[in-house]
Amino acid sequence: MGLENGIQLIMKQKIDLDDWNIIPEYVHIEFDEFNTNEYKDGYYYDICYWRKCSCIRDSILNNIFNEYNSAGGIFEIDKPNQIEQIQDILIYHLLNPEAWRSAIWTLDEACRNIAQCIINLTWLKNFMAEHLGVKVIFYDSF
């Protein structure tokens, strides 16, 4: 089971606070700045994070990256529709409790985080459209 899985935005420069604009569809939701880690090659922003949710991990690896029985790794999200596909996977798991398996969390415990990830991915799509050439990865520490 993948221990740490998530999506990161990698930038050479720190994101200007003006870029943390509210998404029109979600005006009533407060956006905090994403967790940021600074490394020698830039800033890593945690857009989404799952811990020990292999049902989500497996769906993303199998359906988007054609990776079956993956031993982990870093996978670049470089096609425009991949963000929507990940959102669809998250929505599917929220709406289909029978699909929720192999996780240390119950769906009730995880649903708030999953919903926030869906919103964060909408922000990411908008950000990527305005900032061409940014790097986005799905990481899996299996």
Each predicted region: which residue ranges?
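Acidic (Asp/Glu-rich) sequence patches and key acidic residues
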Residues: 1-134, 141-142
